[in-house]
Amino acid sequence: MERSHQHQQLRKEEHDTLSKLKQMPVESLNLEAISIATNLYRSAQRLRVKMETEVLSTYNLSWTAFSILYDLWVWGALETRKIAELSGISTATASNVIKTLEKKSFCRKSIDTRDRRLVFVSITDSGKQAIEELYPEFHKGETELIAGMTKDEQKILTGLLRKVADNLHTT
């Protein structure tokens, strides 16, 4: 019941947004693009808040800190600029988040021996332990995200989201 109420609320929100945007002096307003972008943004925000509140708070981690730690866990040592790129944040923001993770002993920095301007970051055993403890609960949130979708709908959505990501790929 609550779920359908949220769905209706989102529809009303969409309707209100579109009604307001129709008043904008834009020649050809693509209402579907607006709906997709709005729903994608709202879904991402809700997921982020849910995960930070219900899962990541046990380690006092932000979504961004968890994302960086997760990337280090998956790929091993990464250069700071690559971490920023993967997380969709500036290098300065990445450096600040890495400092926080370093203070928690979840990662360590090392300077490239050939090019001292390059800083590589790697996950520590404590960082691995944090990911391995957090991920089962994190995954529960991921599965809640797709509750009520058939396997076919999940595959279709995955394909469509990959297209969206490809459209926004900047490098």
UniProtKB/Swiss-Prot annotation:
GO function terms (MF aspect): DNA binding; DNA-binding transcription factor activity
Which residues does the UniProt record annotate as the domain HTH marR-type?
33-166
Q: Does the keyword Transcription apply?
A: yes
Which keywords fit this entry according to its UniProt record? Answer: DNA-binding, Transcription, Transcription regulation
Q: Which domain of life is it from?
A: Bacteria
A Pfam family it matches:
MarR
- Set out the biological process GO terms recorded for this chain's protein: regulation of DNA-templated transcription; response to stress
InterPro entries referenced in this protein's UniProt entry, alphabetically: HTH_MarR-typ (IPR000835), MarR/SlyA-like (IPR039422), Tscrpt_reg_MarR-type_CS (IPR023187), WH-like_DNA-bd_sf (IPR036388), WH_DNA-bd_sf (IPR036390)
Q: Does the keyword DNA-binding apply?
A: yes
Give the DNA-binding residues.
80-103
Q: Which PANTHER family match?
A: MARR FAMILY REGULATORY PROTEIN (PTHR33164:SF89), TRANSCRIPTIONAL REGULATOR, MARR FAMILY (PTHR33164)
Task: Output this protein's name.
Answer: Uncharacterized HTH-type transcriptional regulator YwaE
Native species: Bacillus subtilis (strain 168)
